Amino acid sequence: MKRGFAINREIKIVLVGPPSSGKTTIKKVFFEMANPLKLLEHPLKPTKGFSSSIYSFFNWKIGIFDLAGQENNFWFNKEIDIFNNSNMIICVLDIFNKISSLKKFIYEVLDIISSLNLKNCKFYIFLHKIDLVNQSYSKSLLKYLEKSLEKKIKINQNIKIFKTSIAEEYFFHSFKIIYKILTVICNDNLIQMKETELKNLEIELSIILRCKYEIKYYNQDVANYFKINANELKSHLRRLETLKFIESLVFEPFAFHLTNRANWFKIGLKSEMEKIAKDKFKLGIEIMHAFLNLNEVYGII
């Protein structure tokens, strides 16, 4: 996919931010279903230049350009054209950075949006790694930035700020943010699904909710519990493997266990206190439905 494109049903997203802010990690965890715990324990090496990846998402193609933070002066000046035709710019900021640095970076990106006349480009700011600070600080920082950008936001409704993290206590929250961003930018009613797909997802989410983390489950026992045959269960487990929610056991191919992704997803879903149980179940189904339809087509490093 070219650097600049504006063809119908093609979406261009640019990830930008200071060095080591977590841009690539977010892409890996939510777009490529990487293990968040592994990436927390073994952080990725810094991106050099830029990496581009293309994903299919229902009837859309999403191109993501991940820009190396060490080369921001280059992107903001000589190579500013890499932002051309962007449908969305996601600015990932390490919440530990100085507030003055955060503001400066945000305004630099806003200047690019203005200079390239990206009127319809959505600008989403991620205050990332919020698990490493107390909640009162993250809330006060969010309010401060919203107040600082108040005039800009009134003029441009496409500007939004989110608090994100790939850590356990915020994993589902961030998953939900990415889900909402995808559904908004594609401007489609992606929630609608066939009755058969809804039933499949109900079983698959029920498997996640019923199973306990780090416990071994035999396929036949699970099939008996849900009153489905072995082939039907195999299909459900294959889909859950696509989401990296389960892993088959190497020496016991007819058994599986939940991954930490599934466990963190389940913990977050259950903690959605503002919704009644039925709505929580529906939200889980909608998110799984969306991400089962997100697939990497190819990537260029």
Segment roles from a protein language model:
Residues 59-76:
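Switch II (G3) loop of P-loop NTPases
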Residues 227-243:
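Short amphipathic alpha-helical interaction segments
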Residues 260-298:
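Short, amphipathic alpha-helical interaction segments positioned at domain boundaries
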Residues 1-42, 60:
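Conserved G1/Walker A P-loop phosphate-binding module
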Residues 74-98, 112-115:
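Inter-motif core of Ras-like GTPase G domains
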Residues 133-194:
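Canonical P-loop GTPase G-domain recognition
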Residues 193-225, 284-298:
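Short amphipathic alpha-helical interface segments
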Residues 86-107, 131-137:
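Conserved Switch II/interswitch segment of TRAFAC-class P-loop GTPases
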